[in-house]
Amino acid sequence: MRTRTTRATLLLAALAGAVPLAVASAAGPTGIGRMVVTPTTLTAGSTGNDLTFSYTANRSLTGQTIMDVPRGWTAPQRRGASSPGYVELKRGTCAGSTRIASIAGRRLTIATACKRGHGYQLLYHKATVPTIAADGYIFLTQTRASGRKAKFRPLARSGQPVVKVKGGPATGLDLTLTNVTTVGTPFSVTVRAVDPYSNNAFPYGGTVTLTSTDPAATLPGPYAYQPSDVAQRTFTGVVLRTPGTQTITATDASGLTRQSPPITVNASS
């Protein structure tokens, strides 16, 4: 049985900068310290977000820290304090030599001189969030001590700053269902409430009703979405009974609606 979705579901978050956490937990020595980010959750496509990255050394570090801003986020810059992506450093309890040394593309290099237990803050202003929702965009952070032979090493997985990106408010519905069926054969229809970027909407608690151009169709009753559904529900037991071309439409109580592409209903043999 062939199926069709009315909008492409974009799951290739890695291509947009969501880096698997495994990169920060590879075998071998890890970097020095921990970097924590706040807030930890933002909305896809939102603008004007201020993020604070707080670094704490777990042993003394005199050297450098690098942090890579994932693709899809506003590129960091120091040219204009009022422009998106502006970054600044607050030395906190680290030495006065701690500063932003350079920005090259999406990579910040920070000259770091922090004793054990000391730390600084990196402020990232007016950032635009990627339009693809993902469980974790990692701002990969690495450190190295002074010395020509020293190498950059990523912080431990638990010490990496990670931001979850969730979908925004619902602006439409999306249907996934068969485009060919036989009279009297049950099939399922999956209905997602989506934001403008086709992410599952958040939050969503609408009540969805299915209707059909087939007057003899058997359809499940209305369903009120729960938080555990994460804006997605599969309606089972849909049966079309009139041969020819039919459609199914999903509508929620707020007026969002989506009609399926044509469904070919073959007579039973």
Residue ranges and their predicted role:
Residues 20-22, 96, 251:
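Intrinsically disordered, low-complexity boundary segments flanking structured domains
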Residues 42, 133-134, 156-157, 161-269:
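Core sequence-specific DNA-binding domains of diverse transcription factors
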Residues 25-172, 181-182, 196-198, 269:
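Ser/Thr/Pro/Gly-rich, low-complexity intrinsically disordered stalk/linker tracts of secreted
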Residues 2-27:
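Secretory targeting and sorting signals
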Residues 3, 140-147, 210-213, 251:
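Intrinsic-disorder/low-complexity, polar/charged segments
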Residues 9-13, 81-83, 264:
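Intrinsically disordered and other compositionally biased segments
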Residues 1-6, 78, 90, 191, ...:
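Short, intrinsically disordered low-complexity segments
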